[in-house]
Regions:
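Conserved ABC ATPase signature
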Residues: 144-148, 152
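Helix N-cap at the start of a conserved alpha-helix in ABC-type nucleotide-binding domains
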Residues: 180-182
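H-loop/switch region of ABC-family ATPase nucleotide-binding domains
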Residues: 204-205
Length: 212
């Protein structure tokens, strides 16, 4: 069953067309890699599917809910409640981590469940600690982002994305900001997530990893 559907997607920045007539379906539980040359619109496509960029035209459906569709040549987005539902069903791992620098690792992972989903703090903390343990970060719960290595920061970013128990996880070049020796560390973590049966869409330049 298709959990993510994109139809005739177009995205322009002014007169520059970045995405043109993009259509595809991704089934529940699939792991898909998006590869292409730098500047080809891979990250923009991911951002369009995750409500971080508005589209120019087309239709995006996530888990049976229409995120956006084109009516009379204009993209029309779903209402606030549906957008929130979709947001809580998707997680996004950024190139540059995007952690809150003034929050501890634990609070970074807890923040969305508590503030967006309304999960009680004790429950959110329990889940956050479980995720940090799974990703080998249980000893870093009270540390701050400035005290972490790049690989550790990216693992915290992955834990944060998993905290809302999303159905789809988007990775935008998850190793691009890392030193070469840390790349394997993060790729190993991503591979370990396959047992969670989460649909994953990964933008990457790591061709060997994409093949796996």
């Amino acid at each position: 069953m298709s959990i993510l559907s994109v139809k005739n997607l177009e995205k322009k920045f002014g007169d520059l067309t970045v995405l043109k007539d993009i259509s595809f379906n991704i089934n529940d539980g699939e792991i898909i890699s998006i590869i292409g040359s730098s500047g080809s619109g891979k990250s923009t496509l991911l951002r369009c599917m995750n409500q971080l960029e508005t589209i120019t035209s087309g239709t995006i459906t996530i888990d049976g809910k229409t995120l956006v569709e084109t009516k009379n040549g204009t993209p029309v987005y779903a209402g606030k409640d549906v957008l929130k539902e979709i947001l809580m069903e998707t997680g996004f791992v950024f190139q540059n981590f995007n952690l809150f620098p003034h929050y501890s690792v634990l609070r970074n992972v807890m923040e969305a469940p508590v503030c967006v989903a309304g999960v009680p703090k004790k429950q959110a903390e329990k889940k956050a600690r479980e995720l940090l343990k799974k990703l080998g970060l249980e000893t870093k719960a009270d540390a701050y982002p400035c005290e972490l290595s790049g690989g550790q920061s990216q693992r915290v970013s992955i834990a944060r994305a998993l905290a809302l128990e999303p159905k789809i996880l988007f990775f935008d070049e998850p190793t691009s900001a890392l030193d070469p020796e840390l790349t394997g560390e993060v790729l190993k973590v991503i591979k370990s997530l396959t047992d969670l049966n989460i649909t994953m869409v990964i933008v990457t330049h790591e061709m060997a990893f994409a093949k796996e």
